[in-house]
Amino acid sequence: MEPGFWHEKWQQQLIGFHQQDINPFLVKYWHTLALPAGAQVFVPLCGKSLDMCFLAEQGHQVIGCELNELAVQQFFEDNQLPMQQSALGEHQHYHTEQVSLYQGDIFTLPASITGKVSGFYDRAALIAWPESMRAQYAKQLAQLLPQGSVGLLVTLDYPQEALSGPPFAVSPTWVETHLSDDFDIQLLDCQDVLADNPRFVKKEVPWLNEAAYLLRRR
């Protein structure tokens, strides 16, 4: 998935992947991570997700990484948050009291930025990558996370041949095969969400499962 693809999507506001509401699995299961208020939480490929507002409301310090500048700017504008901007190497750093977003390539994000995080949340990152690039992202995520950090992973799974991603289908088998070397994995929930996703219904995708996993960095 080339950077130009995502920049074009944001420029044209073709952002069907952006959810207008907080993810239900986040609301339902975040407490199972048992993170204290004040804990740093990393959100990879964060876009302008409202989920970051939920995490901040839990008292966390949110650290996000997003490739597209417009997405980062819209997060602060849409939520009427004052922010400051500064350069950090090849990344731009946008921050307010509880949210720090780093605009740039996650593969070149300095590990020092996430060195003190104790939690992480991935709803739209893993499923954004085609299978040919997904394992590389998963390894980069693991390298950015300290040992013992805990996170909530949300995936979508469906017959990939029925629809071209993103979001791409990520099966439970893929999660176990590619993440188990770096994470302890616990499946928390899996639900059929086809009726809630008109794009998939329109394309006659036969089923669509959303799953939530608790991950712990080994």
UniProtKB/Swiss-Prot annotation:
GO terms for biological process: methylation; response to metal ion. Its EC number is 2.1.1.67. GO terms for cellular component: cytoplasm. It comes from the Bacteria. S-adenosyl-L-methionine binds at residues 10, 45, 66, 123. It is found in: Cytoplasm. Keywords: Cytoplasm, Methyltransferase, S-adenosyl-L-methionine, Transferase. The keyword S-adenosyl-L-methionine applies. Pfam families: TPMT. It catalyses: S-adenosyl-L-methionine + a thiopurine = S-adenosyl-L-homocysteine + a thiopurine S-methylether. It is an enzyme of class 2 (transferase). GO terms for molecular function: thiopurine S-methyltransferase activity. Belongs to the class I-like SAM-binding methyltransferase superfamily. TPMT family. This is Thiopurine S-methyltransferase. The gene is tpm.
